[in-house]
Amino acid sequence: DTQHAWIDIPEEVRDKYAYYRSTPLVRAYGLEEALDTPAHIYFKNESTNPLGSHKINSALPQCYYCKQEGDTNVTTETGAGQWGAALSYAAKLYGLEAAVYQVKISMQQKPYRSAIMRTFGATVEGSPSMSTRAGKDIITREPNHPGSLGTAISEAIELATTTPHCKYTLGSVLNHVALHQTVIGLEAEKQMEMAGEYPDEVIACFGGGSNFGGLAFPFMRHNILDGKKTTFVAAEPSSCPKLT
């Protein structure tokens, strides 16, 4: 929806957000002292929710809309496991069956993440797997393939297209995911107001972009509409930079 500046959060999603939101905005006095800076430094802590990351902010509305459309299953890929865990949790709350393909090498390195997904009732497979044609083709060509997000996405999409009443979900990158994540920045804006502050700089990590957008976009609108001069910094990994 690009026609409206504001889109209501469905009441049922708001109720589930209330399980863990709002998340803390914390002033980092120790960091200020260590840097010997006159600046006031705040950080928005999204790790305090049940899944430990911002991903649940989008998993809940995605599962809500799938349920509204009559779906019974959701599928996705996950790398480190944060999105897979979030989707598994949200699917459980909405009575959906979740199937998660996790990058095989990551699944081996982080076994507890897949345990969390299974705790919430999800089916979890290391990708590439033998459960899809895409996975079988990859393993046939390269039996020791460590997996990648590309292999996991291929398998998740194949399952979604071959399973009745099943939707493929994605935890970052897409417009609707960034929209869901703006709950972070909208909260931060109100919390800064309560503290009597307004940011000169907004800094956020940038992987797929939804966390950065979620924090930054609500403040960006004041630059556009109200003449604010806030600077926005996307902190990307040097190993796989998405912007530069």
Predicted regions and their residues:
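PLP-dependent amino-acid enzyme catalytic core
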Residues: 1-244
